[in-house]
Amino acid sequence: FDFWNEYRYVVPKGYTRFLGKLSELTDRGIEVHFFIGNHDIWTYGYLEQECGLIVHRKPITTELYGKVFFLAHGDGLGDPDNKFKLLRKIFHNPTCQRLFNAIHPRWGMALGLNWAKHSRMKREAGKELPYLGEDKEYLVQFTKSYIKAHNDIDYFLYGHRHIELDLMLSHKTRMLILGDWIWQFTYAVF
């Protein structure tokens, strides 16, 4: 979602067909996991109750086909930007969330969508910064630090940065950032 905020009685416009397809999958018994990120913090049960999604607010570690995966959106993991950390605390604060939800959906959704658009457009040509290299890419730095205490993980899989990255961090450990769903529609297959 570019911006998702659940109001008690309002479903955000523009996502009906997508939500319907997700519901179709879960109705057929297919698990759909959704990792909360910086554009969709404000989900309060609709995606679980109405669409059958399994919503994750934090990273998870799981075993699939004999391999150990660390799965996360990537939001808030290792980002050194103090302004971003402050904004993230405000966005995750339950009181601030209740106050925002008191705003009429017409204005609240417009504000959120415009904020997301502005955030994207302030980057060059509206696209994510290119890969910064192992020494400067904060998700790589986070992963390298995390591996020191959790060296049993085979794959780290993230979104958030909207860049394609497939990086071997050791003979055993591989890190992937899924890429850009807005321009390139990239994804990973295991």
Per-segment meaning from a language model:
Residues 74-138:
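Active-site-proximal loop/helix segment associated with metal-binding centers of metalloenzymes
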Residues 24-29, 64-67, 99-106, 187-190:
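Short C-terminal domain-edge/linker segments immediately following a structured domain
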Residues 63-65, 169-170:
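Active-site beta-strand termini and strand-to-loop segments that position acidic
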Residues 45-49, 110, 114, 122-126, ...:
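Short amphipathic alpha-helical patches
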Residues 1-64:
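Core catalytic region of metal-dependent phosphoesterases/phosphodiesterases
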Residues 4, 42-43, 78, 109, ...:
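Hydrophobic positions within alpha-helical membrane elements
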